[in-house]
Amino acid sequence: DTERQRITKLLQNKGYYKFNKDFLVYQADTARNTYLVDLTLRLLPYQRRKEDLPRKHRQYKVGEVNFLADDEIMSVQEGTLEEFDSLRYKGYSMYYKGKAFLRPQVLVDFNRIRPGELYSEQDVQNTYSNLGRLRALKYSNIRFREVNGENGTQLDAYVFLAKNKNKSMAFEVEGTNSAGDLGAAASVSFQHRNVFKGSETFMMKVRGAYEAITGLGVASQDYVNDNYMEYGIESSLNFPQFMFPFLSSNFKKKIRATSEVGLKFTSQVRPEFSRTLASASWSYKWTDRKRMQHRLDLVDVNYVYMPRKSSAFQEYLDSMSLRNSALKASYENQLVVRTGYSFTYNSAGNAMMRTPTKNSYSIRANIEEAGNLLYVASKLVHPNPKDGEDYVLANIPFAQYVKADFDFAKNFMIDPRNSFVFHIGVGVAYPYGNSKMLPFEKRYFSGGANSVRGWSVRSLGPGVYKGSEDGRMDFINQAGDIKLDLNIEYRTHLFWKLNGAAFVEDRKS
């Protein structure tokens, strides 16, 4: 049956619109009186009904391609489209009532059914997939009507488009109780799914929070208030195409890409400190042949500024610096301006979403850099800084480093219930120029569900370091600039949806 499906798919992509696997039958011959069977694959002629005369299978070409902004039409007959306004654009006909809600160029770019070409079922499925990425559409439906053209039988295509609701708003309210301190938070979000009539999605969210803090004690004389306030705003604009100047339209049509610009700002004011967090990003995502995924972060800016820390809070952070360096790192000024690219490949393709049935492997790679353009620009403006001084932007020294990671995993299927998985991961990061060490969140660490699972996150240091005499651990012994992961895991299905695993791991960082 697999061979019949393969041949059917091949013929349907070569213009044979009405072909299906029922026209392919096998004949078995055992007349030679052996243990072998001769199989002959026969092609039956086209016959719609048993009483019809058999005839050759016809090859169809696409005639007209029409887009209709109406999903309620059950069939297209003569005069059906007379009540619609129409527009002719680059050989395609657009029909709509009132105003067109999508630009004609968008429909042409996302369509794969071309007038004058042989009918292809793959082109139809690709068109469905492309239109499904347009958030301005609720759904789409493609129908064909057989007509007699100049060069034989043709198919006119009708692409029906159901408009989605463009605008939506959401309001959220929540109450909090942190160790007896009562508070409340509220947020309002707005989304527009078709800002420029190209299915661009714009989102904006505003959030505010308040909490009354009690029990500040004698240290309260160093505090400016006795409550916690937070407010923030974030927004994003998503394009369903690869938006970049100087790229040809053919390139944009080949890849299923999205482009996104994002901005975020948050201000936090507590008795102990004030903190400002801001970020900006411009990124691209695209897939290739359903197995490969790409992400390009053209620019990704993360900014943390601490304009105020009380002396009591600073003393607390200093006392915790050796016990919990991650806590202290969260309350330090930071500026990272990075560019990165990541690549993911899975040999199973869409099958990875189901229970694996055969051997497969996956590859993940990532490379990023930060601060190089800022460093060059700073050198041009101020070529000779004082000894020991770092270049700054917005009064914060910016990070400068390069980092690369590579992960490979191989899945060996023993049977449908049991498998072995082998994994190796390597990574290296190097700070230089304006940085003497990596930003804390960019360092490698061990422990946790995605690392050596026998230890909790960041609890496993390199080598056999035992810490200081009082048992405290310094951050440099819990994170590193190089990593090496090795993992062998046996997986088995126990019962229902419960799976079990036994693993052996080694990690250096």
Model regions: which residues?
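Periplasmic polypeptide-binding modules associated with outer-membrane biogenesis and secretion
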Residues: 1-177, 212, 250, 402, ...
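Extended beta-sheet lipid-handling architectures
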Residues: 2, 9, 19-21, 185-190, ...
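Short beta-strand/helix segments in adaptor/scaffold domains that form protein-protein interfaces
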Residues: 17, 52, 255, 350-354, ...
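Acidic/polar loop patches that form or flank catalytic/metal-binding clefts of enzymes
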Residues: 20-21, 139-142, 201-202, 292-294, ...
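C-terminal outer-membrane beta-barrel translocator/porin domains of Gram-negative envelope proteins
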Residues: 80-83, 92, 176-179, 295-493, ...
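Gram-negative/organellar outer-membrane beta-barrel architecture
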Residues: 100-101, 120-364, 453-454, 460, ...
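Conserved small/polar residues in nucleotide/adenosyl-binding loops
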Residues: 509
